[in-house]
Amino acid sequence: MTRVSFKAQMLRAREEAIVASVNRLLAEKGFDAMTVDAVAADVGIAKASLYKHFSSKEELAGAAMIAALDRAIAQVELLAQDASHATELDRLKALARWTMQVQLAGEMPSLPSQNSALRAALVANKAYGDRLIRLSDLLGDWIICGQHAGRLDPELPPEVVLYTLFAKACDPVLSLLKAGGSYSDEQIIEMLTRTCFTGLAR
């Protein structure tokens, strides 16, 4: 086994601290309000040192999204091995709940959909693209199996179900209900899981 040098370990630890800071700032402020200066100050390093790891604000956001996708993929793989979630529908519901828990905890990065520079950077980021495809494929298998088993509406295109699940990661209803203070996190998650999978009709 190749031994990692102390310097390499320190650089890796600093990079992880930067990504963790970006993730939190994106969740709290959003991409437009987050600044490179704020990230550097939060980590406790000079901006010049930060640029040794990431060349732009867009690259910082990409690193945070890669970390978020890695976390989601790990959760999917965990659910796939959990006997308490026997059906694909059970697993999709569990993943939706987990996603909302992460958002309510302030750990889900929030990115704008209309920022052309950010979109171009993410499209060009192979690591991000590979993980997004991996997660989509894993969930796509569950969705198609669930439709074939009659547990999910077979008339809906699978991508509609997939994008609906992805939307739970940035659902504004979560923060609105939490800010209202009338419901616990558990109640909010349960209600939004019901509206996602059962709908609004009685």
Describe each PLM feature range.
Residues M1-T2, A94-W98, D137, D141-A149, ...:
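C-terminal peripheral helix-coil segments that are non-catalytic and often amphipathic
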Residues S21-L25, W98, V102, K168:
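Short amphipathic alpha-helical elements of helix-turn-helix/winged-helix folds
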Residues A63, E77-E107, P158-L165, E186:
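Hydrophobic alpha-helical connector segments
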Residues G44-F54:
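Short hydrophobic/aromatic patch on the recognition helix
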Residues M1-K29, A33-D42, E59:
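Basic, helix-initiating cap at the start of DNA-binding domains
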Residues V102-V123:
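Amphipathic alpha-helical segments used for helix-helix packing
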Residues A61-A68:
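Alpha-helical DNA-contacting segments of helix-turn-helix folds
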